[in-house]
């Protein structure tokens, strides 16, 4: 059986990869994927702690986090399509003004 520490370590590694992806990359699509990786790593930690304590609270919270993440992806992709149509790029450095 895999210990809770292994799950937490994996979650921390995935979260760190997500933070590095958001800070280093300039492509909006990669930044969205990195944010999703960070949310999923938090979900993994919640599930691990929920499993260790034999309670279902972490699983319930994870379900709501997944629902909010789905809404975030829908809004984010709509914004991305709008920005791409206006600027013809997905590079975040090229989109520095609010003017169309």
Curated annotation (Swiss-Prot):
EC number: 7.1.1.-
Free-text function comment from the UniProt entry: NDH-1 shuttles electrons from NADH, via FMN and iron-sulfur (Fe-S) centers, to quinones in the respiratory chain. The immediate electron acceptor for the enzyme in this species is believed to be ubiquinone. Couples the redox reaction to proton translocation (for every two electrons transferred, four hydrogen ions are translocated across the cytoplasmic membrane), and thus conserves the redox energy in a proton gradient.
Organism: Herpetosiphon aurantiacus (strain ATCC 23779 / DSM 785 / 114-95)
Cell location: Cell membrane
Transmembrane annotation, as ranges: 4-24, 29-49, 60-80
GO terms under cellular component: NADH dehydrogenase complex; plasma membrane
GO BP: any one term: ATP synthesis coupled electron transport
Broadest EC class assigned to this enzyme: translocase
Bilayer topology: Multi-pass membrane protein
HAMAP family on file: NDH1_NuoK
Protein name: NADH-quinone oxidoreductase subunit K
């Amino acid at each position: 059986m895999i210990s809770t520490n292994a799950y937490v370590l994996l979650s921390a590694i995935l979260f760190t990869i997500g933070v590095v992806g958001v800070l280093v990359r300039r492509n909006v699509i990669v930044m969205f994927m990195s944010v999703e990786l960070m949310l999923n790593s938090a979900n993994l930690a919640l599930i691990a702690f929920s499993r260790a304590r034999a309670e279902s609270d972490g699983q319930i919270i994870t379900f709501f986090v997944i629902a909010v993440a789905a809404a975030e992806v829908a809004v984010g992709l709509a914004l991305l399509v709008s920005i791409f149509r206006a600027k013809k790029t997905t590079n975040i450095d090229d989109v520095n003004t609010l003017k169309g």
